[in-house]
């Protein structure tokens, strides 16, 4: 049997935890045979519980008959699957049952005497990078569980929480939301001991309706703290700072110095970026202790993410020198986040800055700032191309916001702008057109602003531009629906 990733449980215990009905079976039901849980049947190993979820394209129930042969000890289902050679626990809703199982697993871990701390992270931007930095730091202090990529919703968070076992010291829980109430639901499953709020931006503005509603949603992580839990807030964001009023206990502040009277627990002084857009700064705590940091990842915006991670790590006992060296050691984070590589094609080659995981106006501008800083001090300046996909869920101002980003790209130093829409989605295509119009309005040479109807066309446009201009650097940034992350993978695999 594989090594346990969750607290070992019997089938009877699981059925009780998820309020399910254990179908008659010949296998022992009171022995702790379950040691892991998955929703992807391809990940099943001996000792796994398979949670069958009906998705938009695939229904996990179709795979229940196969998982027994892979070693699954049980399947959570919303209806009995006839003929399946695996014990079945029937529940009303398998997504909710997954959450209930995760909640039970965390409660089992908390019941042990050994130390265990849950750190919850939310914000409109920066969650995954902060999670990656914090996991790297905390792993030096004890066994740390954190999601792969951005598993931060009602499925991803429980799956991550089901990797917690008796040896786990820290759980870093990324919590995302598209609607008010989602983070409250996540904290009801996994209440954090420490809540970190990074930023309230305009991501998902169309779903929420206003920045105030976004702030309300993000504040649910503070309300969901365990009694006496610690709140860590970005002092430079007024919506985030206002959450101190609902904090149940102590509040710690991180941010850049802006006012002499600001009481910052963690700050960055003398922030600079080199020609490869790697930030360096002096990390300082509230006692005046300081240490030099040079981030191994790109983007000045990541200074704030590093400060958030540093605040947590120092609060949990890591010395500032160890934090600084730990931050400097991180050279790679989750895919498609300011990842730099060289793309070689038969016709040409260019440098790629792949930030294609997702996009909103704030992260777009941060990525464009990084592009403008790329070899900014070089005698021979690179030819900078911004390849930008449409942004989703921005509400009634979406066209104006796209025009603003197009204008920002050109005014910020992009030599060429390629906006990417969709041949199958007229709304997405119209947003890409609006971005191109914003760029053309301020471009010295409007022919350097091009509108692509899909990633394939964008590929051809970039190839032509890079062939004509030596020393090309390309920023790739857009919402997942624009298909740019797939383009990045094709480029880098080639």
Regions picked out by a protein language model, each given a short descriptive name:
Residues 2-122, 129-140, 337, 428, ...:
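Short, basic phosphate-binding NTP loop
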Residues 70-73, 86, 225-230, 247-250, ...:
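A short helix->loop->beta-strand "cap" motif at the edges of active sites that frequently abuts
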Residues 14, 48, 67, 101, ...:
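Residue-level signal for inorganic ion chemistry
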Residues 75-82, 235-239, 256-258, 422, ...:
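Short, polar loop motifs at secondary-structure junctions
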Residues 1-19, 46-49, 59, 132, ...:
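ATP-dependent carboxylate-amine ligase
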Residues 69, 189-190, 222-227, 245-247, ...:
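Short, conserved loop/helix-junction motifs that constitute active-site signature segments
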Residues 27, 164, 175-205, 241-290, ...:
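Extended acidic/charged loop-beta regions that coordinate divalent cations
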Residues 15, 97-235, 239-247, 468, ...:
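Phosphate-binding loop of NTP-binding sites
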